[in-house]
Amino acid sequence: GKSTLVNLIPRFYDVASGCIEIDDLPIESYTLQSLRSNISLVTQEVTLFNDTIENNIIYGGHTSDEIQVAIRDSHIDEFIDDLPKGLQTRVGDQGILLSGGQRQRIAIARAMLKDAPILILDEATSSLDSESEKLIQKAFDRLMENRTTFVIAHRLSTIENADRILVLSDGEIVEEGTHDELMSQEGDYALLHKMQFND
């Protein structure tokens, strides 16, 4: 349901019916390269190469100043100083030598460097402990500034400040609005929020 919906945006799947538009143009009118170059994707499962932290952050062509800003804003600087070789520390296959929170921060730094106008966060905090989630939420807040962001989250703290929240159930949109609007409707969103925050 939810992941399938956002996977339609970068055209991992084609729309069977209806139309998805970006800037009033159907997404099919863009080349895949053009479309995907304008989308950053951060998922629960981060793909890392058996290489250094630095090489896992960059995919080429970035200045050291840009890299340093991404490192600071994604809170990577809070753990790289403790590693034996800092940015040059190797992460192992799929980042096995790093915690889940550290891997997520590398994915966030990548998205910051890409600086795409569309951001998709697909359950990006679901497997993290609450301390890592707090750090990553700060990084997400920075990353989401001035861009269209699609967030799939069961942890509602991730989306409380969203301009528009859609609640899906059985593949259908059942509620839509801001956090305050949805709380006042006392529907599925409000119930889930009350369960998570005991309010």
Place the predicted regions along the sequence by residue:
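Conserved glycine(s) of the Walker
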Residues: G1
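ABC-family P-loop ATPase nucleotide-binding domain
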Residues: F197-D199
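ATP-binding/catalytic-site motifs of ATP-hydrolyzing domains
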Residues: C19-E21, L25, E172
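Conserved H-loop
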Residues: D77-P84
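ABC-family ATPase nucleotide-binding domain "signature/switch" substructure
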Residues: T4-F12, R36-E45, D51-I58, T63, ...
